UniProtKB/Swiss-Prot annotation:
<dbReference type="GO" id="GO:0034605">
    <property type="term" value="P:cellular response to heat"/>
</dbReference>
<keyword id="KW-0053">Apoptosis</keyword>
<dbReference type="InterPro" id="IPR036034">
    <property type="entry name" value="PDZ_sf"/>
</dbReference>
<feature type="region of interest" description="Disordered">
    <location>
        <begin position="1"/>
        <end position="40"/>
    </location>
</feature>
<feature type="active site" description="Charge relay system">
    <location>
        <position position="222"/>
    </location>
</feature>
<dbReference type="InterPro" id="IPR025926">
    <property type="entry name" value="PDZ-like_dom"/>
</dbReference>
<comment type="similarity">
    <text>Belongs to the peptidase S1C family.</text>
</comment>
<keyword id="KW-0539">Nucleus</keyword>
<feature type="region of interest" description="Serine protease">
    <location>
        <begin position="59"/>
        <end position="260"/>
    </location>
</feature>
<dbReference type="GO" id="GO:0005634">
    <property type="term" value="C:nucleus"/>
</dbReference>
<keyword id="KW-0378">Hydrolase</keyword>
<dbReference type="GO" id="GO:0120174">
    <property type="term" value="P:stress-induced homeostatically regulated protein degradation pathway"/>
</dbReference>
<keyword id="KW-0645">Protease</keyword>
<keyword id="KW-0720">Serine protease</keyword>
<protein>
    <recommendedName>
        <fullName>Pro-apoptotic serine protease NMA111</fullName>
        <ecNumber>3.4.21.-</ecNumber>
    </recommendedName>
</protein>
<dbReference type="GO" id="GO:0006629">
    <property type="term" value="P:lipid metabolic process"/>
</dbReference>
<dbReference type="Pfam" id="PF13365">
    <property type="entry name" value="Trypsin_2"/>
</dbReference>
Length: 983
């Protein structure tokens, strides 16, 4: 698959921005806004800090009137759609019809997709708003609120007077600049004829309109602000600006005024277009493109205040003007009306949708007349999308087609996730061409194709990126519709302001049964006969493919490919790193000899040694899969071994290696988002480049006896908080033999126990300083073979709400367990089988003996997940308790959806919900008992506790239409997950 390349940005594209104040769909982003909640709340007269001018009194009266009509818009785009991603943000709008509750703001605020929001008036009254119109091209839209919701403020409206925008006019931009409650920015209009700014590729851009330019230094949050003159009339709409100067761009309000009048008259807002992008070019450039002197003279006489004419910049293939108008053509007239501005073009086209009009152009000095049928802009503006397989699709929009000069047709992937996640770095911009060798020219066809594909089916697809249409990408994808069960059509409803959902298929077709298949392994060739025993070890490797669509236990990855080792080919068991298989809410496929794939499931997750056991049906694999011979003695420093494994390109690698060390260690925790990691490990280290190149493998003797598994551990870089790091080390076979022996008799080790503490190595000097006697030092010197050290308690895990805290304390030095000297992590093995252990320790320079209980690990893995208000909630998994002293509740927020109520109202990831409406929520059962009775669109009070035990109180408004409540739960006494939906 090729890497898509972006087209080079123009100067405008790289320096212009829209003035939202908020965040996009990246996880954990929240709006970084400081708002003075007490502003103007005392009812006293407001004082505005205005620049010194000769008419301050007039401006004072004007601003006093204007601020009552200006609102702060707090909104969220709840899902990806077309060019826009999910986000939570704020902007500005203003009332243009107080009777009907109409608010004018920017189109990029209203957004092309699902919108939820409310407005806050100057006196801090709040009203829910719904979108009723967003223009297909120009940067304006309308929201509507119920005027009855505003009880304490006398509603006022601002008048739209586009003709009053003149060069030199003094203006004020009244809005929420930089997220502040109210900002008033002063400036003067300097231009009326600027071409629309470009904000970049694959995002919304206005075009085919003039923009007004001024220097007002507005920033985030001011989008949608009214630009008013001294009399308080709105002359333009704030839309964007330059990041490298104080320049602001205002939208002329001729089209917003017409749209408002249509809404007031309950008439449709017709919008016409011929799929041509025009640019205003100065006369000198028009001459170079072929404008005749006679035509220039006539235009200058008709329009003495204009500096140029409209020139075709882009003509879309298969559009109304394709083949009739060409790039570089100068527009002279439409329907015998001379043209010099976009304003007149809009007026003519909007009133003639479906009609054929005469266009007169000049091309190379020649006058050409073309009859062109006016198209409907609304018909090429998508108002539907489909969710299926964890991804989202809509018909290709005019916005994207114009950006890349392609026909307005095809299926556009606005959220390439789930089954359709092609590249983690690019979630949007893909055009889907075929699925399972069936063409998908439009959304309706895609729906029918997806209905025919069974669940868990691998199918070929072809697709392209809009930035690299020369390259056709072909990929085999796995259609998963049981974890991500939604297959629905969303249709925009401008009456309710919501998007109406229709389920397209109750259940997918059942998975096809797997048949036994043949495969052949190619043994590793060796010229050295002494290593012939290693040749067949390739038959013990199997490729593991994991799909984990739900980010349970804070696991950051959704798709993984690695290699595992078959530890029992007769019963079908595979050992794999928990870096790649962190939990059992996933789909797993094993690929043998790069030829056949069979499904597998997780049957065992070791709580601390970083490996998982997978089970497959060996009868499906007609190949010579081999169970290797396992050694029974641990590897030691200095021993030579032979490495066989796979690098990050999934290629087989072999090398002679030497054991550089065997260390007692813990994988560094991810402090920002705790997730599973290996602890209390005895790890094998290599002095070889293999140690950084290979994720999976084995260390073997010359005769093929496997001495260690080479696996990957997920942790955090110790010098860079928040940065993932992969630690690649060896796990000695002797640490796994007890589990392998049980697997040979088809017994899954379910009754494993665990000591809830982490240990670290300390030197003899440190131990001596902290109170270890010479007698004990002598004992350690007698029994230690490689390195003389003590183990000390690094941290003790927080107990669950139903447990007593572990009596061990951080800093305790361990001398013996059950009267056996503890010289390394392996000496802690009794914790896996014993209910309690007798520890002899040094605490505060005193030797003492304590009894430490172990815990049953049968319930340590997550078995219940709640999806509520856009938050993924579960009991705090073990990695969380490892880093805490006390757990505030068993209701832990592990992740949140971008654009959901949890994101909008500030529920932090890694926080605990302790109360809902002042009712204590100790666990998920009590949480569900409370929230199931809370109506939709209702404010509730939440009390949270941060990961650092800082209490927080917030309010949240439910939104079950877009974010319904559901659960994933394991059946009682079973490993099967079931979905529970709450309507």
């Amino acid at each position: 698959m090729s890497v898509p390349t972006k087209r080079r940005l123009s100067f405008d594209e790289s320096t212009n921005k829209r003035f939202l104040n908020g965040t996009h769909s990246t996880e954990n982003n929240t709006s970084n806004i400081e708002v003075d909640e007490d502003y103007g709340s005392d009812g006293s007269e407001q004082i505005f800090d205005l620049p010194a001018t000769t008419n301050n009194n007039q401006w004072q009266e004007t601003i006093t009137k204007v601020v009552n009509a200006v609102v702060s818009i707090q909104f969220t785009h709840v899902s990806n759609f077309d060019t826009e991603t999910s986000l939570v943000s704020e902007a500005t709008g203003f009332v243009v019809d107080a009777t009907r509750g109409l608010i004018l703001t920017n189109r990029h605020v209203v957004g092309p997709g699902p919108f939820c929001g409310y407005v806050v008036f100057d006196n801090h009254e709040e009203a829910v708003v719904k979108p009723i119109y967003r223009d297909p091209v120009h940067d304006f839209g309308f929201l509507q609120f119920d005027p009855k919701e505003v009880k304490y403020l006398q509603l006022t409206q601002l008048e739209l007077k586009p003709d009053l925008a003149k060069v030199g006019t003094e203006i004020r931009v009244v809005g929420n600049d930089a997220g502040e409650k109210l900002s008033i920015l002063a400036g003067f209009i300097s231009r009326l004829d600027r071409n629309a700014p470009e904000y970049g590729s694959l995002t919304y851009n206005d075009f085919n309109t003039e923009y007004i330019q001024a220097a007002a230094s507005a920033s985030g949050g001011s989008s949608g602000s009214p630009v008013v003159n001294e009399d308080g009339d709105v002359v333009a709409l704030q839309a964007g600006g330059s990041t490298e100067a104080s320049t602001d761009f205002f939208l002329p309000i001729y089209r917003p005024l017409r749209a408002l009048q249509c809404i007031q008259k309950k008439q449709p807002i017709t919008r016409g277009d011929i799929q041509v992008e025009w640019q205003l070019k100065p006369y000198d450039e028009c001459r170079r493109l072929g404008l005749t002197p006679e035509a220039e003279a006539r235009a200058r006489k008709l329009f003495p205040n204009k500096i140029g004419l409209l020139v075709a910049e882009l003509v879309l293939p298969q559009g109304q003007a394709d083949g009739l108008i060409k790039e570089g053509d100068t527009l002279i007239s439409i329907d015998d009306i001379d043209i010099s501005t976009f304003i007149k073009v809009d007026e003519i086209l909007d009133e003639n949708v479906g009609n054929e009009l005469k266009f007169v152009i000049q091309r190379g000095g020649e006058v050409i007349t073309q009859m062109i049928k006016i198209g409907d802009l609304h018909s090429i503006t998508p108002d539907r999308y489909v969710d299926v397989g964890g991804a989202s699709f809509n018909n290709l929009s005019y916005q994207v087609a114009r950006c890349y000069c392609i026909p307005v047709k095809g299926v556009f992937i606005n959220d390439a996730s789930g089954s359709f996640e092609f590249a983690s770095y690019e979630k949007s911009g893909w055009l889907l061409e075929t699925v399972d060798d069936m063409p998908t020219p439009d959304l309706d066809t895609l729906i029918e194709v997806m209905k025919m594909i069974p669940d868990c089916r691998r199918v070929p697809i072809t697709y392209r990126h809009v930035s690299d249409l020369h390259t056709e990408n072909i990929q085999i994808i796995y259609i998963e519709r049981h974890w991500q069960s939604s297959f629905r059509l969303a249709v925009r409803n401008d009456t309710t302001g919501l998007w109406d959902f229709t389920d397209l298929q109750e259940k997918p077709l059942p998975p096809l049964s797997h048949e036994p298949q043949n495969a052949k392994f190619i043994d590793i060739p060796f010229s050295d006969e002494t290593r012939s025993g290693c040749s067949s070890l390739v038959r013990s490797f199997v490729q593991v493919r994991l799909i984990a669509p739900v980010p349970m236990d804070s696991y950051p990855y959704r798709k993984e490919i690695c290699y595992g080792v078959v530890v029992d080919s007769v019963n079908g068991y595979v050992l794999v790193s928990r870096r790649f298989v962190p939990h059992d809410m996933c789909d797993i496929f094993l690929i043998f000899a790069e030829s056949i794939d069979v499904p597998a499931k997780v049957v065992f997750l070791h709580p601390n040694q970083n490996y998982a056991i997978l089970k497959y049906d060996p009868s499906l694999v007609l190949a010579d899969v081999k169970t290797p011979k396992f050694g029974d003695k641990p590897l030691k420093r200095g021993e030579k071994s032979y490495f066989i494994g796979y690098n990050y390109n999934l290629r087989l690698v072999t090398d002679d290696v030497k054991i550089s060390g065997v260390s007692s260690l813990n994988i560094p925790p991810a402090s920002l988002s705790p997730r599973y990691r290996g602890t209390n490990l005895e790890c094998i280290l290599l002095d070889s480049k293999i140690s950084v190149e290979c994720d999976s493998g084995v260390l073997a003797d010359d005769d093929g006896t496997v001495r260690a598994f080479w696996i990957t551990y997920l942790g955090e870089a110790t010098c860079d908080q928040g940065s993932d790091r992969m630690y690649r080390m060896g796990l000695d076979v002797t640490d796994v033999l007890s589990v392998i022996e049980k697997l040979k008799v088809n017994e899954i080790p379910k009754q494993l126990r665990l000591l809830e503490a982490e240990f670290t190595s300390v030197t003899i000097l440190q131990g001596r300083t902290r109170g270890v006697s010479q007698e004990w030092i002598n004992k350690f010197e007698e029994v230690c073979e490689d390195e003389i050290k003590f183990l000390a308690v690094e941290r003790v895990s927080a107990p669950t709400l139903h447990q007593e805290k572990n009596p061990l304390k951080a800093g305790d030095i361990i001398l013996s367990v059950n009267d056996i000297i503890v010289k390394n992590m392996r000496d802690l093995k009794p914790m896996f089988t014993e209910q309690e252990l007798k520890f002899r320790i040094i605490r505060q320079k005193k030797e003492t003996e304590i009894v430490v209980p172990t815990i049953d690990t049968t319930t340590i893995n997550t078995s219940h997940v709640v999806f509520w208000s856009g938050a993924i909630i579960q009991a705090p998994h073990y990695a969380v308790r490892q880093l805490m002293e006390r757990v505030p509740s068993e209701v832990y927020v592990t992740r949140k959806s971008a654009g959901g109520p949890a994101h909008q109202y500030g529920i932090a990831t890694n926080s605990f919900i302790t109360h809902v409406n002042d009712v204590e929520t100790k666990d998920l059962v009590s949480l569900m008992k409370v929230v199931k009775d809370i109506p939709d669109n209702t404010y509730i009070k939440l009390r949270l506790m941060s990961f650092d035990n800082v209490p927080i109180a917030i309010s949240l408004k439910t939104n079950y239409h877009y974010f319904p409540t559901s659960e994933l739960k394991k059946k009682e006494g079973s490993d099967e997950w079931i979905e529970i939906e709450h309507k």
